[in-house]
């Protein structure tokens, strides 16, 4: 029987991407929680370049970067497909996944920075939300009729974004501004494939609230 291990952080949307893919495929795995402030030798040896989670270990082989891991899982294990079978739909799924992944830094920094830098990040995130709101009109999933690759990549904006907003007090998403996105987000969070695998929202909120407070304190400290 194949040995599958996943190194991750409980609060990380990137780790959750991999967990969801494994669950969709029905792959049994061992989850190993890492300590952000004291990373294990296994993590450092498995991802010596970036030293980050997630890391998938399959029969001793180490695979890193969440979207790379998703494709590996889809190609390696039997079970429901994560990427569409149709070449055009597969290309669309990869396009939206990359679009969403490229926006991660701006989304995160919006809630950790202040002043002009924050305003620039907010503008970029709002432009992204406009694009998504237009794309998601009358759609339940990004590509096709089932939850898949691009939807997994969207977990940061579907769930974590709302937590970031509440933790920081910076509100970007309203149903008036982005009605299609808000409708899609509500259905996403209640999707049976992921609902039971979301991290506890209250714990996630407390974690990111402390990070936002630490960032604010650092920004206001004398230089």
Swiss-Prot record:
Q: Does the keyword Repeat apply?
A: no
Similarity annotation: Belongs to the GST superfamily. HSP26 family.
Domain spans labelled GST N-terminal: 2-81
Q: What species is given as this protein's source?
A: Nicotiana tabacum
Q: What is the lineage of its organism?
A: Eukaryota, Viridiplantae, Streptophyta, Embryophyta, Tracheophyta
Tissues where the protein occurs: Root tip-specific expression.
Name this protein carries in UniProt = Probable glutathione S-transferase
One GO term under biological process is: glutathione metabolic process
> In the Enzyme Commission scheme, what number(s) does this protein have?
2.5.1.18
Which InterPro entries does the record match to this protein? Glutathione-S-Trfase_C-like, Glutathione-S-Trfase_C_sf, Glutathione_S-Trfase_N, GST_C, GST_C_Tau, Omega/Tau-like, Thioredoxin-like_sf
Gene Ontology molecular function terms on file: glutathione transferase activity
- Which annotated residues bind glutathione? 12, 39, 53, 65-66
State what induces this protein. Answer: By auxin.
Q: What range(s) does the GST C-terminal domain occupy?
A: 86-218
Gene3D superfamilies, per the entry: 1.20.1050.10, Glutaredoxin
Give the source's domain of life in one word: Eukaryota
Return any one Pfam family short name.
GST_C
Q: Which UniProt keywords apply?
A: Auxin signaling pathway, Transferase
Which reaction(s) does its UniProt entry say it catalyses? RX + glutathione = an S-substituted glutathione + a halide anion + H(+)
| A single Gene Ontology CC term | cytoplasm
């Amino acid at each position: 029987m194949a040995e599958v291990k996943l190194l991750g952080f409980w609060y990380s949307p990137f780790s959750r991407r991999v967990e969801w893919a494994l669950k969709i495929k029905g792959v049994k795995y061992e989850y190993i929680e890492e300590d952000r402030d004291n990373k294990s030798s296994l993590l450092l040896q498995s991802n010596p370049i970036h030293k980050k989670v997630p890391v998938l270990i399959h029969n001793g082989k180490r695979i890193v970067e969440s979207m790379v891991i998703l494709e590996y899982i889809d190609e390696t294990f039997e079970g429901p497909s994560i990427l569409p079978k149709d070449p055009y739909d597969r290309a669309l799924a990869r396009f939206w996944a990359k679009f969403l992944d490229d926006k991660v830094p701006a989304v995160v920094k919006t809630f950790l920075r202040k002043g002009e830098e924050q305003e620039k990040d907010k503008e970029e995130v709002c432009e992204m939300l406009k694009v998504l709101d237009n794309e998601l009109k009358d759609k339940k999933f990004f590509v096709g009729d089932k939850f898949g690759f691009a939807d997994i990549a969207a977990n940061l904006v579907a769930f974590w974004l709302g937590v970031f907003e509440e933790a920081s007090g910076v509100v970007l998403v309203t149903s008036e501004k982005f009605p299609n996105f808000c409708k899609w987000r509500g259905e996403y969070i209640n999707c049976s494939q992921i609902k039971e695998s979301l991290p506890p929202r209250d714990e996630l909120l407390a974690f990111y609230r402390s990070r936002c407070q630490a960032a604010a304190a650092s920004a206001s400290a004398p230089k």
